């Protein structure tokens, strides 16, 4: 992370010392997304929920990182759930792409990793979708909340999991526990 930030700083320093042709070539190396991410990643790391950890496999690529959510309450307590977050070039006009890498029995996450979280939608009927004013911090806090207060059995993506909960809460909990033992340790 510091590597990209250092490169951006170096790029800014170059602006003052090179001709306008060289400066424009130098400036093109970093997209607006990358410049935003330097600030947003610092803010994210300073404001992470204590049940979350971020990992940047390549510190020079702030647009690709992993998030681990380890809920401390509710159905998913004791599990470690991995998410892959990829920030597209058009960020912050479009939301990041997020996939759950951990197989999970959850009404708002499919077993293949698709996620139902309104702020990850480019357009949302209820007006809570993505907006350029949102940040990575909002995404991480939203993903964390899918295991607690945003857990929604009445507007599910995984209909089978939601119906399972509505029909037999105890059996639902048993299946969640089984998935945690098998996939989320």
From Swiss-Prot:
<dbReference type="GO" id="GO:0005524">
    <property type="term" value="F:ATP binding"/>
</dbReference>
<dbReference type="InterPro" id="IPR000608">
    <property type="entry name" value="UBQ-conjugat_E2_core"/>
</dbReference>
<comment type="function">
    <text>Accepts the ubiquitin-like protein NEDD8 from the UBA3-NAE1 E1 complex and catalyzes its covalent attachment to other proteins. Together with the E3 ubiquitin ligase RNF7/RBX2, specifically neddylates cullin-5 (CUL5). Does not neddylate CUL1, CUL2, CUL3, CUL4A or CUL4B. Mediates neddylation of the CUL9-RBX1 complex.</text>
</comment>
<keyword id="KW-0007">Acetylation</keyword>
<dbReference type="GO" id="GO:0061654">
    <property type="term" value="F:NEDD8 conjugating enzyme activity"/>
</dbReference>
<feature type="domain" description="UBC core">
    <location>
        <begin position="32"/>
        <end position="185"/>
    </location>
</feature>
<comment type="subunit">
    <text>Interacts with UBA3 and RBX2. Interacts (N-terminally acetylated form) with (via DCUN1 domain) DCUN1D1, DCUN1D2, DCUN1D3, DCUN1D4 and DCUN1D5.</text>
</comment>
<keyword id="KW-0833">Ubl conjugation pathway</keyword>
<dbReference type="InterPro" id="IPR023313">
    <property type="entry name" value="UBQ-conjugating_AS"/>
</dbReference>
<dbReference type="GO" id="GO:0045116">
    <property type="term" value="P:protein neddylation"/>
</dbReference>
<keyword id="KW-0067">ATP-binding</keyword>
<keyword id="KW-0547">Nucleotide-binding</keyword>
<dbReference type="Pfam" id="PF00179">
    <property type="entry name" value="UQ_con"/>
</dbReference>
<dbReference type="InterPro" id="IPR016135">
    <property type="entry name" value="UBQ-conjugating_enzyme/RWD"/>
</dbReference>
<feature type="active site" description="Glycyl thioester intermediate">
    <location>
        <position position="116"/>
    </location>
</feature>
<comment type="similarity">
    <text>Belongs to the ubiquitin-conjugating enzyme family. UBE2F subfamily.</text>
</comment>
<comment type="pathway">
    <text>Protein modification; protein neddylation.</text>
</comment>
<keyword id="KW-0808">Transferase</keyword>
<protein>
    <recommendedName>
        <fullName>NEDD8-conjugating enzyme UBE2F-B</fullName>
        <ecNumber>2.3.2.34</ecNumber>
    </recommendedName>
</protein>
């Amino acid at each position: 992370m510091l590597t990209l930030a250092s490169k951006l700083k170096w790029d800014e320093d170059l602006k003052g010392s090179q001709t306008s042709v060289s400066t424009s070539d130098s400036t093109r190396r970093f997209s607006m997304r990358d410049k935003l991410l330097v600030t947003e990643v610092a803010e994210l790391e300073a404001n992470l929920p204590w049940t979350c950890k971020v990992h940047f496999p390549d510190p020079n690529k702030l647009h690709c990182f992993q998030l681990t959510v380890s809920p401390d309450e509710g159905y998913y307590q004791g599990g470690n759930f991995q998410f892959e977050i990829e920030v597209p070039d058009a960020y912050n006009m479009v939301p990041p792409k997020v996939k759950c890498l951990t197989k999970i029995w959850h009404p708002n996450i499919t077993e293949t990793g698709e996620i139902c979280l309104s702020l990850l939608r480019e357009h949302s009927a209820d007006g809570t979708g993505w907006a350029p004013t949102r940040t990575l911090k909002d995404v991480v806090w939203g993903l964390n909340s899918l295991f607690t207060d945003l857990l929604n059995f009445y507007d599910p993506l995984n209909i089978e999991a939601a119906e399972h909960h509505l029909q037999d809460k105890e059996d639902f909990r048993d299946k969640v526990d089984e998935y945690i033992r098998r996939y989320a340790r």
